[in-house]
C-alpha cells in the first residue's frame, strides 16, 4: 500500500502536471503512440503522455481530434486461431530446393528402388540425395557388381549413426535382406563412447587442460550401407560359343553412402565416380570406333593353333567377324594342352630335324613349315634335353638368333606369328633359359620382357605368369662372390611385383601353388621366414589340393617343419586322396636323406606295416624297396649283420622282407 501511495502522490499535484503541458504543447504535431486494444479496455493501465495532454484545453488540430476519437471507438471482435491449429499453406514445387528433392530413377530400376529412396528421404531425413548408376562399370570387389549408389548427407554425427542403424533394420524387417554397414557403431556402443568422451572432457576442464580428442572413433563422418543383392536377374541360357571361366555376377545391388556435410565435401565421392563413368564412356566409344574400322575377317595360321576334338568333328570352325579386341582367343600356355594328339610326333620331328642339321648351319623358312614345327613342339624338345645340352642350344644370350639350329627354328617360327604371340613366346624362352641356369639370361631381362608384354596390352596367361614367378624365385648359379647357388632379395622383390600385377588384374594368388613357390624360395633363408609362410598357410585355410599339398609336404620336411609335414600326411586319406606308392617313396627318401636315426626308426616301424593296410595295398618293390633299405641303414647301420644273426626286431623283420622281394 505504501508503494502505491508513493506512486500516486506526485501525479495528483499541479506543479508536476504543468511541466508536462509545456512538453505536450511543444510537440503538438507528434502522432500519439498506438496502444493495443487490450490495454485500452484496462482501466488500470498506465497512462501515456498523449492521454494526459488530452485532458487539457484543446490546442490540437482537428485531425488530431479525429484520430483520438477514432482510437476511442470500440474495435470489432475478431476470432483468434492458435498457431497449432493454423493450416500450412502449400509450397509450390518451384520453391523446393534441390536438396529437398528425391533423385530421378535410372533406366530399368529394381522394384525396391522407389520405396527405398522414399524411406531414405522422408523417414531418415537425408539431404542432397545423389543417385549414381554404376551397373555398367567394373566396381571394386568390396562393393560387388551391378551397383546403384546413393549418396546422402546427414545433419550430425548422431543423425548419421541413427540413420544407418534404422536403414539396416528396415531392410531386414521389410525385405528380409542382410545389409552390412561399414563404420556404424551400435546403439549401446555409441552411448558408451559418448559417455566416456563427456567424462574425459569434464576431467580435462577441472584440471585446466585443453581437451582435443579428434580421433575418438565416433566422428568418422562416413558410413557405407551395402544392402546386398536386392533383385536377382533372370538366369540366362548358357551360350555355347562362350569360352572362359569364372562366376558371372548377377543381380542388382544398392549401396548407400551417408556422410556428414564436412566429410562429404572432403571426400567428394560424386566427382570420383563421375570421372570413372566418363572414362568408361570414352573407352566404349573408342572400342566402337575400333570395331567399326576393323577388317571383316581374321586370318589365322593353321599350324600355330591346335583345334580340340569338338572343332575337328564339326569340320568347320565358326569364328566371329568382330575384332580380336573383343574375342575370346586361344593363347600360348606354358603347360601342355590336355590330350594333344600330335605332341609326341611334333617333338620327334624336331629331333629328326635337329639330327639332320644342314651343312651350312642355316635353315630356310620352308623347312620349318614342311616339318610341321610349332613353338610348342620346340619348347617340348628343349624341356626333354639335359641342362647342359639345353644351355648349348640356347646360344650366347637373348640377342643370339642363329648360332644354333634350335634358335634358327625358333626365330623363323616367330617371324610367322603375330606380335602378341611372338612376344609371349620370347617370355617363355627366357623362363626356360633362366630355369636351366644359363648365365647369359638375366632375371632383370625376364622382368623387363614381362612388363613390356603386359604394358602393350598383350594377354599373358596365368600359367605363364606363375612360371615367371617360379623362375624369378629359382636360385641363381654360383658366381665370383658366391661359391654355391643363392637367391638374392632383388629376385624375390621382382617375383612379388609380378604377383601384385596378377592380383590387380583379378588372378587369385592366394593358392597352394603360389605359397609352395614362396615356401621353397624361403628354404635358404632363416627358419623364422619359413615358419612365417607356414603360419600364413594355416591362417588362410585354403581349399585342400592333393597335388600341391604333396609338393608342400616335401618343402616342409626339408625346412624342418616336421609337424606340418605329418599333418598333411595324415590329412591325405581324409580328403579322398589315398596315399600312393609315390607318396611312400617320398616319405622314406626324405628320412634317408635327413640322416636322423630316431626319426628313421620311428618312420619304418610305423609306416611300413601301413602300406598293406592302404585302400589300395602298396607292394614293397622297385624304387620304394631301395628307399626303404636306405632308411633301414640310417636307422641301424649294422642292420644287415643283425638280420643275418637271427634278430627278431621290427627293423630286422623289414630287412628280411626287403631281401625276399629283391
From Swiss-Prot:
Residues 284-301 have a biased composition (Basic and acidic residues). Residues 52-83, 284-313 are annotated as: Disordered. Probable mitochondrial mRNA stabilization factor. It is found in: Mitochondrion inner membrane. It comes from the Eukaryota. GO terms for biological process: mitochondrial gene expression; mRNA stabilization. It comes from Aspergillus flavus (strain ATCC 200026 / FGSC A1120 / IAM 13836 / NRRL 3357 / JCM 12722 / SRRC 167). GO terms for cellular component: mitochondrial inner membrane. Residues 52-63 have a biased composition (Polar residues). Residues 1-46 form a transit peptide. It is a peripheral membrane protein. PANTHER family: ATPASE SYNTHESIS PROTEIN 25, MITOCHONDRIAL (PTHR28087:SF1). Belongs to the ATP25 family. The keyword Signal does not apply. This is ATPase synthesis protein 25, mitochondrial. Keywords: Membrane, Mitochondrion, Mitochondrion inner membrane, Transit peptide.
Amino acid at each position: 500500500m505504501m508503494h502505491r501511495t508513493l506512486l500516486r502522490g506526485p501525479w495528483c499535484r499541479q506543479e508536476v502536471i504543468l511541466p508536462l503541458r509545456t512538453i505536450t504543447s511543444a510537440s503538438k504535431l507528434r502522432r500519439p503512440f498506438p496502444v493495443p486494444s487490450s490495454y485500452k479496455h484496462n482501466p488500470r493501465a498506465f497512462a501515456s503522455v498523449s492521454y494526459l495532454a488530452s485532458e487539457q484545453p484543446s490546442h490540437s488540430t482537428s485531425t488530431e481530434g479525429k484520430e483520438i476519437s477514432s482510437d476511442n471507438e470500440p474495435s470489432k471482435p475478431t476470432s483468434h486461431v492458435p498457431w497449432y491449429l493454423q493450416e500450412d499453406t502449400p509450397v509450390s514445387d518451384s520453391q523446393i530446393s534441390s536438396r529437398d528433392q528425391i533423385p530421378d530413377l535410372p533406366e530399368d530400376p529394381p522394384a525396391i528402388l522407389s520405396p527405398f529412396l522414399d524411406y531414405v528421404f522422408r523417414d531418415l531425413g537425408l539431404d542432397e540425395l545423389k543417385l549414381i548408376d554404376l551397373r555398367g562399370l567394373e566396381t571394386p570387389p568390396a562393393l560387388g557388381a551391378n551397383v546403384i549408389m546413393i549418396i546422402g548427407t546427414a545433419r550430425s554425427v548422431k543423425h548419421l549413426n541413427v540413420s544407418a542403424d534404422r536403414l539396416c533394420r528396415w531392410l531386414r524387417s521389410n525385405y528380409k535382406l542382410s545389409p552390412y554397414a561399414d563404420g556404424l557403431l551400435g546403439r549401446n556402443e555409441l552411448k558408451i563412447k559418448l559417455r566416456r568422451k563427456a567424462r574425459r572432457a569434464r576431467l580435462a576442464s577441472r584440471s585446466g587442460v585443453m581437451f582435443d580428442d579428434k580421433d575418438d572413433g565416433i566422428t568418422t563422418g562416413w558410413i557405407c550401407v551395402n544392402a546386398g543383392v536386392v533383385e536377382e536377374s533372370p538366369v540366362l541360357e548358357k551360350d555355347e560359343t562362350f569360352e572362359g571361366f569364372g562366376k558371372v555376377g548377377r543381380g542388382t545391388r544398392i549401396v548407400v553412402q551417408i556422410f556428414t556435410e564436412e566429410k562429404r565435401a572432403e571426400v567428394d565421392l560424386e566427382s570420383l565416380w563421375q570421372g570413372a563413368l566418363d572414362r568408361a564412356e570414352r573407352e566404349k566409344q573408342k572400342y566402337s570406333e575400333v570395331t567399326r574400322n576393323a577388317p571383316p575377317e581374321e586370318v589365322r595360321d593353321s599350324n600355330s593353333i591346335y583345334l580340340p576334338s569338338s572343332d575337328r568333328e564339326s569340320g568347320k570352325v565358326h569364328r566371329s567377324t568382330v575384332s580380336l579386341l573383343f574375342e575370346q582367343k586361344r593363347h600360348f600356355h606354358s603347360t601342355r594342352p590336355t590330350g594333344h594328339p600330335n605332341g609326341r610326333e611334333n617333338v620327334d620331328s624336331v629331333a629328326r630335324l635337329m639330327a639332320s642339321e644342314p651343312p651350312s648351319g642355316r635353315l630356310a623358312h620352308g623347312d620349318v613349315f614342311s616339318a610341321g614345327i610349332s613353338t610348342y613342339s620346340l619348347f617340348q624338345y628343349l624341356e626333354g634335353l639335359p641342362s647342359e645340352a639345353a644351355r648349348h642350344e640356347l646360344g650366347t644370350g637373348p640377342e643370339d638368333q642363329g648360332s644354333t639350329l634350335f634358335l634358327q627354328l625358333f626365330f623363323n617360327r616367330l617371324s610367322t606369328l603375330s606380335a602378341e604371340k611372338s612376344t609371349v613366346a620370347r617370355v617363355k624362352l627366357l623362363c626356360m633359359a633362366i630355369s636351366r641356369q644359363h648365365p647369359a639370361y638375366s632375371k632383370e631381362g625376364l622382368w623387363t620382357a614381362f612388363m613390356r608384354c603386359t604394358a602393350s596390352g598383350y594377354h599373358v596367361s596365368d600359367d605363364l605368369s606363375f612360371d615367371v614367378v617360379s623362375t624369378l624365385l629359382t636360385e641363381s648359379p654360383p658366381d665370383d662372390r658366391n661359391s654355391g647357388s643363392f637367391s638374392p632379395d632383388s629376385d624375390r622383390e621382382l617375383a612379388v611385383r609380378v604377383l601384385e600385377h596378377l592380383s590387380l588384374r583379378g588372378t587369385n594368388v592366394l593358392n597352394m601353388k603360389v605359397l609352395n613357390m614362396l615356401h621353397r624360395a624361403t628354404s635358404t633363408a632363416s627358419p623364422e621366414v619359413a615358419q612365417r609362410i607356414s603360419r600364413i598357410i594355416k591362417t588362410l585355410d585354403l581349399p585342400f589340393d592333393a597335388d600341391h599339398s604333396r609338393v608342400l609336404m616335401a618343402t616342409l620336411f626339408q625346412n624342418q617343419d616336421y609337424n606340418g609335414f605329418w599333418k598333411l600326411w595324415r590329412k591325405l586319406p581324409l580328403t579322398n586322396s589315398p596315399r600312393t606308392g609315390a607318396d611312400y617313396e617320398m616319405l622314406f627318401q626324405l628320412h634317408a636323406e635327413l640322416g636322423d636315426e630316431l626319426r628313421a626308426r620311428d618312420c619304418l616301424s610305423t609306416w611300413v606295416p601301413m602300406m598293406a593296410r592302404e585302400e589300395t595295398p602298396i607292394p614293397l618293390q622297385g624304387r620304394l624297396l631301395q628307399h626303404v633299405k636306405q632308411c633301414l641303414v640310417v636307422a641301424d647301420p649294422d642292420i644287415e649283420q643283425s638280420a643275418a644273426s637271427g634278430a627278431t626286431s621290427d627293423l630286422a623283420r623289414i630287412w628280411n622282407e626287403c631281401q625276399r622281394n629283391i
